[in-house]
Structure formats: C-alpha cells, structure tokens
C-alpha cells in the first residue's frame, strides 16, 4: 500500500500536486516536497483554462481571497490579432455555442447570418463583453452566466456539468507561494535542499533522493516536477522524449513585465498577436501586463526577438529586464514509469498559444488520483494513465498546428514555412472535412483534451477556414427561430454591458 509520496521540484507544478494530494487523501498519505533554493522558476504571467476553477474549488479556496494575493485577473477568452490581415482579430471564448433546432449558431450564421457582423460577435456574448472590458461578475459577486451552478464544490474535469464562463490570469510565482502555504499548513513536509543523487533498487525503481543537507529522502511514489530537465523521468529512468519540432518549431520565448499606465485598460482576455517569426502573448495582471514573444530561432535570433518585443510593447523602456526561455516542445512517451510520475514541464509542454500549461498539470494530477496505486502497482492502471495523458497532449498539438495552417499570412519566411510544414494525420483529415461542413463531435479527436467542438469551429471560422456552402438541411428549415436567437444574443449583450462592472472595477473591489 502506498504510504508516502515524494515530490521533487516546487513551482506551480510541485505545489499544485502537493495541495491536490493533500486535499484528496488528507493524512492517509504522507507528502514531502523537495525543492532547491537555487532553481530559477520559469513562471511568468500565466493564463489558464476555465477548468482551473475546479482545481481551486476542490481545495476549498475562495476566489475572492486567493486571486488578489496572486495579482490575478479574469480571462473570458483569447483574442487573436493579425493572424490573417493586419488589424483583423477574433475571439476564442470559453462560452459554448447555443443550439437552435439541432444546429449550433455557427451553422445558422453561415446559412442566414448577417455577414457584416463577424462570426464571433454574432454567435457569442463574450465577444462584446471583451470589447467593453467587462468582468464576469456583478459587484455583489454574482456570476453573469446563470446556467452555471457554482455550488458543485469538489468537482473534477470529468464531472463538470457546464463550461465555466471564465478563467484567470495570475502571477505563477505568487500562485506557487500561496499553494505552498496551503499545503504546508495541511501537513506537507517541505525540504529546501539540492538533490545530488537519485537512488534506485535492483528493479530500477526509485528508492530515494539523496540531498546535500538532509540525506536520503525515501518514499513509495515519486513525482517529477523538475521542469524541462526531467531529473527523475528522463535522467534517472531514461524515459524517451518525443519532440514536436517537426510540426511546432517554436522553441524559445522572451518575456517582459510591463507596467500598465491606465488601470481601467485592464482587459478580461489574453491576446495572441502574430509577429514576424512567431506570436506574442499579452496577459493582463492586476497592475501590469505580462508580455512574451514565442518564436523559432531558425528564423530570428534571441537578440532580434527581444528588440521586436520591446519595440512593440515597451518602446524606450530599456530598464525592463527581459527573461529568455528555451523550451522543450513535446511529451514523454510515458509520463508514468515504474514508481515515478512526471507532472508539468517534465512530462509535456507545448507553446502556450491556448494556455494549456496549467491545464496539463491539473489533468495529470486528477488522473494520478484516479489511477492511484493500491496494494500493488497495477500495470493496467499505469498503462491507462499513460494512454490518457498521451492522447490529451497529442490532441492539443493537433489543435495548435491548426492555428498555423489556417493563418492567412505569408509575409515572412516564418509564415511561408508554416504553410509547407508537416501536419498530424488527424488534422489533415479535419481540414479536408472542413471544406464541406463545420466540424462536429464525430470528427473531433476522440479522447478528452480540453478543446471541444465549438473551439475547433471558432478557430476555423476565425482564421477563414469556411465551408464552401452551409449545411443543405438548413435551406429547408424555418430560419425564424435562429434569427430570433441572434437578436436575443445582441439584446443580452446590451443588458450585460450595462449591468456588469469593468474588469478593473470589480477586481479593485476585492483587493
């Protein structure tokens, strides 16, 4: 029976894991977290999936308490700028498409919608709320989306009943610090020391980690949260890493923390802006913006990328320190080997174009608890865990490649190369089908990876991948109910914009 878990590495991945295991198992499992005091954390301004709400709810944490501690803000979706033409943009929100007479509103927009209004504005409330910089909550704390039940308590991704209408922006280092306080208060043993050697038994399983000051720290299960270096999963156990560089070549990023001159300009969305050799994120925190340029060093040098980033978001601010990051893009073929599970960057990472970093961590932790060993180490459970994690990451990879294949620009060598680069087989089939109709549940990746049908539809239409004609069935149906729903969306948008506070106004009220 598993009695003790040793987590090697802190940061967001380590402390999310420690907190979740304590929330799940309480004192029935001993948890130790070992982290070096000398490791520089990669954490920058972090954007998340809406599913992260389930993580904080599972821990019993109040958003009004933890979010201000972490310089947090709200995220209603992602705004994609300049992926087609300069000045053009669209939103990829968390809001699901409404359905009328068996067809979603995107199908109806293609058939009878007013093309003078963009797809995202016509079909989503979120588009106009983002434009107006509105918070997703009233000043009394009530949620604008009445169909979402906030009383679910300890629910997981698998139990979610409705898409939660927002996610968060936050300072990843502050979240790690906050969760460390939570975990330590609940009995997690915290060891600040350098791991000098990893011990293995005669089977090759990890027996303990040997530290500089605290000697050997033994355990039954070891969780590798050591980042891209993969101290346990790769360096010790020899896990094979599968690179995605053939389809996702971006391998570096440079980040800046930029003070925001006007507080009221705080936006409730992440921005992904196409650049000459990649794209730039803008993540609004409470008092500043996090900006970063994700690029391929095949097309631009780190120095050139930093200059392009500075000239775009902080001209004349040479005093702002740049953080250069080298990224390992891909996944381990197995993220659970013997008695070691990799979580976070040590397991898998893709460029943060759709804010999947925290989502990967959360999904890995939840699946670890669901597949937790009992009296014996069941190889069927371990295999099932590895299969689920691989399918999740591969599904996200496919979705990200869509962004580049669909982008309507070829103005630099980088973007020209994106058109000719290889793509996953599954994506090729989806793009073939997209020429005749919008994708549906049967054509989306069959395993859960976080991106549902509406996400694929939104990216296709936003990037200009439009079917040659609407669904023929709609030409034989009464369009009146759909036209009434378009009008209802417009009216509800007007009412919400009038009623909701600005993003900054609401967040200032809970500081």
Curated annotation (Swiss-Prot):
InterPro entries: FAD/NAD-bd_sf, Flavin-dep_Halogenase_NPB, Flavin_halogenase, Trp_halogen
EC number: 1.14.19.58
Traits of the deletion mutant: Mutant cannot produce pyrroindomycin B, but still produces pyrroindomycin A, the nonhalogenated derivative.
UniProt-annotated binding residues for FAD: 10, 13, 36, 39, 42, 44, 47, 195, 345, 358
GO MF annotations in UniProt: monooxygenase activity; nucleotide binding
UniProt pathway annotation: Antibiotic biosynthesis
Catalysed reaction, written as an equation: L-tryptophan + FADH2 + chloride + O2 = 5-chloro-L-tryptophan + FAD + 2 H2O
Active site positions: 75
Protein name, as recorded: Tryptophan 5-halogenase PyrH
Top-level division of the source organism's lineage: Bacteria
């Amino acid at each position: 029976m598993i009695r003790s878990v040793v987590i090697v590495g802190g940061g967001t991945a380590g402390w999310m894991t420690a907190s979740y295991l304590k929330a799940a198992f309480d004192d029935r499992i001993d948890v130790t977290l070992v982290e070096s005091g000398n490791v520089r954390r990669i954490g920058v301004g972090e954007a998340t999936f809406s599913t992260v709400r389930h993580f904080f709810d599972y821990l019993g944490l109040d958003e009004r308490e933890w979010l201000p501690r972490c310089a947090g803000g709200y995220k209603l979706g992602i705004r994609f700028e300049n992926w087609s033409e300069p000045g053009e943009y669209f939103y990829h929100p968390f809001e699901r498409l409404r359905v009328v007479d068996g067809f979603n509103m995107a199908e109806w927009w293609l058939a009878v919608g007013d093309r003078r209004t963009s797809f995202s504005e016509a079909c989503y409330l979120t588009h106009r709320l983002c434009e107006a910089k509105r918070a997703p909550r009233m000043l009394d704390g009530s949620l604008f989306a009445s169909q979402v039940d906030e009383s679910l308590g300890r629910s997981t991704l698998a139990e979610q009943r409705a898409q939660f209408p927002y996610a968060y922006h936050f300072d990843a280092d502050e979240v790690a610090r906050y969760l460390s306080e939570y975990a330590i208060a609940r009995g997690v043993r915290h060891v600040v020391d350098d791991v000098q050697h990893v011990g293995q038994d005669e089977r090759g399983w990890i027996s303990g980690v040997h530290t500089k000051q605290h000697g050997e720290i033994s355990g039954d299960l070891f969780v590798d949260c050591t980042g891209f270096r993969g101290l346990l999963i790769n360096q010790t156990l020899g896990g094979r890493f599968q690179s995605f560089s053939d389809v996702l070549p971006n391998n570096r990023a440079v980040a800046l923390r930029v003070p925001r001159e006007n507080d009221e300009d705080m936006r409730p969305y992440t921005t992904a802006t196409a650049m000459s050799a990649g794209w730039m994120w803008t993540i609004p925190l409470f008092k500043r913006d996090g900006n970063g340029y994700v690029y391929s060093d095949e097309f631009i040098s780190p120095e050139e990328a930093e200059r392009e980033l500075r000239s775009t978001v902080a001209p004349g601010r040479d005093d702002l320190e740049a953080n250069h990051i080298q990224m390992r893009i891909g996944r381990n073929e197995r993220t659970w080997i013997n008695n070691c599970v990799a979580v976070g960057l040590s397991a898998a990472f893709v460029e943060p174009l759709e804010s999947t970093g925290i989502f990967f961590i959360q999904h890995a932790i939840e699946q670890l608890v669901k597949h937790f060993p009992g009296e014996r180490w069941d190889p069927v459970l371990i295999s099932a865990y590895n299969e689920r994690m691989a399918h999740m990451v591969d599904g996200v990879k496919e979705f990200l490649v869509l962004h580049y294949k669909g982008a309507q620009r070829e103005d630099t060598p980088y973007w020209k190369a994106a058109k000719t680069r290889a793509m996953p087989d599954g994506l090729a089939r989806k793009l073939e089908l997209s020429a005749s109709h919008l994708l549906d549940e049967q054509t989306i990746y069959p395993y859960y990876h976080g991106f549902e049908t509406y996400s694929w539809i939104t990216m296709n239409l936003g990037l200009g991948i439009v079917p040659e004609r609407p669904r023929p069935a709609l030409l034989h149906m009464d369009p009146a109910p759909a036209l009434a729903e378009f009008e209802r969306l417009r009216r509800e948008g007007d009412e919400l914009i009038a009623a909701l506070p600005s993003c900054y106004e609401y967040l200032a009220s809970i500081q």
